[in-house]
UniProtKB/Swiss-Prot annotation:
Subunit composition and interactions: Monomer. Binds 30S ribosomal subunits, but not 50S ribosomal subunits or 70S ribosomes.
Any Gene Ontology biological process: maturation of SSU-rRNA
HAMAP family noted in UniProt: RbfA (MF_00003)
Gene name as annotated: rbfA
Keyword annotations of the record: Cytoplasm, Ribosome biogenesis
Biological role stated in the UniProt entry: One of several proteins that assist in the late maturation steps of the functional core of the 30S ribosomal subunit. Associates with free 30S ribosomal subunits (but not with 30S subunits that are part of 70S ribosomes or polysomes). Required for efficient processing of 16S rRNA. May interact with the 5'-terminal helix region of 16S rRNA.
Subcellular location: Cytoplasm
Record bears the keyword Cytoplasm: yes
Protein name per UniProt: Ribosome-binding factor A
PANTHER family, per the entry: RIBOSOME-BINDING FACTOR A, CHLOROPLASTIC-RELATED (PTHR33515:SF1)
Top-rank taxon: Bacteria
Amino acid sequence: MARSHDTKGSGGLSQRQLRVGEQVRHALAQVLQRGEIRDDLIERTVISVSEVRMSPDLKIATCFITPLGSADPQAVIKALASHAKFIRGRVAPSLAQMKYMPEFRFRPDTSFDNFSKIDALLRFPEVARDLSHDDDEDGGADEAPRNGDE
């Protein structure tokens, strides 16, 4: 009986998608670092490629990027999208083992914003009080059995 490699039911990416996504991320980061893209905005902006998610057929690479500094993320994404075919050609030699070179799609990486929102929420006095109260209760529960064992 053949084993099913469908990961849609589990909600996760396959090992192959993760591996290829990381290879594409590394190759894309090298192209950006070397400054091979002739665009004023891209040349003067440091761009972080935080993740690349591959489609199940490995034909689409969704690249999550964060421009560092004061650059507008949407403008950077638009500039990268306009050079997507050029980027695809520059990344190709690093990914020669792939049967098909993926189409690049660029999206803003909002995970840093989400982390800062969560951090801000955790710093509220009410939340800090509740967290310290939970720690006190946990510590007290751990102490009681040890005293009873002696």
